[in-house]
Structures are given as structure tokens and as C-alpha cells.
């Protein structure tokens, strides 16, 4: 059976994001509302296709441009921030698991040797996303933000 590995978000999973304060989660869900809506629809579609394609739903928390520190996969938690290198290694591990333990499951990723550095641009990125959610007409006038 074919297998997909979908990069999603722990923010969408009650279990994986239970350590995130409710207010922070509420802000995050609005700051990237269009992305999260797309992910919810994509996940629902892929879960409905489970009879012919298997999917692993990788759900990290916050991501950072940092060095690889080591990772672990989890069905119950995530630890943020996580480096992109650790995320990539986790996705490969989940995809190549010979027993299919992660198939059709929400999978968190833990940085096992301490968290990655907090991305310095994250607060501005979240704030700009929040503004775009409530005032979409301002989009052409707002700065682009992202990893860095």
C-alpha cells in the first residue's frame, strides 16, 4: 500500500498540544487560520482514503532553523521548538517503520537533547498572521514573515 507522510501541526491535536496554554493555542489557531483550515480538510480527505493509501500525520509544535539535536516520535506529546533537521529525521523514521506503528496516527516529535533555539522572528510572524486573520484587507500592506 502506498504511504504518505503529511506535515501537519500539533496545534490541531488536543492531546499533543495539551501543554500549550489555551490562550496561546487560540492565538496560534487564528494566526495561521488558512493553513490550519487546509490541514484539517487535507487530513479528513486522507483519512477517508485509508483503504488504498496509508498516511502518517506528523504533528510537530514550533519549528526552528537550528542544529539537529536528536528526536523521538510520540503519540502523546510534542516538545517545541524543534529543528527542521530533527523534523526531517522524524518524518523519515515514521515513513520507514517496518511495523507501520505510525500509520494513520497523529505523531508528535520530541527533541530529546534539549529544545532547539527559539526562532527570533516567531512573535512577529504570529502577530502578523493574527492581524491578517482579523483584517485580511491589510495583507498587501503587511510585511512578509517566516523562518529566519
Curated annotation (Swiss-Prot):
EC numbers: 1.-.-.-
Signal peptide interval: 1-19
Keyword Oxidoreductase part of the UniProt annotation: yes
Top-level division of the source organism's lineage: Eukaryota
Keywords: Monooxygenase, Oxidoreductase, Signal
Top-rank EC class of the record's enzyme: oxidoreductase
Cystine residue pairs: none
Record-given protein name: Oxidoreductase gedF
Annotated organism of origin: Aspergillus terreus (strain NIH 2624 / FGSC A1156)
Amino acid at each position: 500500500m502506498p504511504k504518505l507522510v503529511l506535515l501537519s501541526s500539533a496545534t490541531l491535536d488536543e492531546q499533543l498540544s495539551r501543554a500549550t496554554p489555551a490562550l496561546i493555542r487560540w492565538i496560534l489557531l487564528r494566526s495561521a487560520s488558512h493553513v490550519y483550515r487546509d490541514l484539517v480538510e487535507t487530513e479528513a480527505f486522507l483519512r477517508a482514503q485509508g483503504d488504498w493509501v496509508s498516511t502518517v500525520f506528523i504533528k510537530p509544535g514550533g519549528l526552528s532553523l537550528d542544529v539537529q539535536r536528536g528526536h523521538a516520535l510520540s503519540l502523546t506529546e510534542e516538545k517545541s521548538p524543534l529543528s527542521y533537521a530533527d523534523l526531517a529525521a522524524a518524518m523519515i523514521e515514521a515513513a520507514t517503520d517496518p511495523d507501520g506503528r505510525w500509520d494513520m496516527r497523529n505523531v508528535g516529535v520530541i527533541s530529546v537533547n534539549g529544545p532547539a533555539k527559539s526562532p527570533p522572528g516567531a512573535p512577529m510572524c504570529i502577530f502578523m498572521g493574527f492581524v491578517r486573520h482579523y483584517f485580511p484587507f491589510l495583507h498587501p500592506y503587511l510585511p512578509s514573515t517566516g523562518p529566519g
